[in-house]
Amino acid sequence: MYYGKSRVPKGIFSAGLDAGLILDVPYIGYLLQNGKQNILVDTGIHDNNIVNGKAWGGYPAEGGNKYVIEALKKEGLSTKDIDTVIYTHFHHDHTGGALLFKEAATYYQKDEFLNLLNPLPTQKNRCDYNIKTVDDFALIKNHCIVDGDLELPNGLKLYKLPGHTLAG
């Protein structure tokens, strides 16, 4: 699902390579459907991470809740149709629409939440996390905190894969 994009120089990902190449990097999520169950993986970038059409690093960007709502609409769904939300990790471009799904069962890794509460200095410098996420998640009604791998009742398997972040 397309939740918007940021337009950035490739060099921020691969210093010294492809100087001058500009990339459109999408904010994405996934919709998993099993019969009548609708599972959303990640919820896009926070509205407040895009200011005057710019996001992380001051690069042009578009996204936010209206993009999440529009992506669902293209699938014939609304926010109320989502039963479950799974977060791969808690970076600001993956958790922005959390409040759209306050009633949904919400799965995330314990280590990821702990890292959100206490980010490493480099994570603070890069602004990986949006501190508003803590307040947003306080309003979610059905937390399913995962500590490692887990198989959901519908057979979907969640695996803890640290690397990009401590848990995802």
Q: For the regions a protein language model found, what residue spans apply to each?
A:
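Active-site neighborhood of phospho(di)ester-bond hydrolases with catalytic His/Asp-centered motifs
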Residues: 40-43, 83-89, 108-109, 160-163
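A short catalytic or substrate-binding loop motif that flags glycine-/basic-rich loops and adjacent residues
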Residues: 22-25, 162-166
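A short secondary-structure junction signal
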Residues: 51, 97, 117-120
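Short, acidic/polar N-cap/turn motifs at the starts of alpha helices
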Residues: 27-29, 147-149, 168
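Metallo-beta-lactamase
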Residues: 63-77, 81, 111-160
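Conserved beta-strand hairpin/beta-sheet module of binuclear metal-dependent hydrolase folds
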Residues: 4-70
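Active-site environment of divalent metal-dependent phosphoester hydrolases
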Residues: 48, 90-95, 165-168
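Active-site metal-binding motif and surrounding structural segment of the metallo-beta-lactamase
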Residues: 58-108
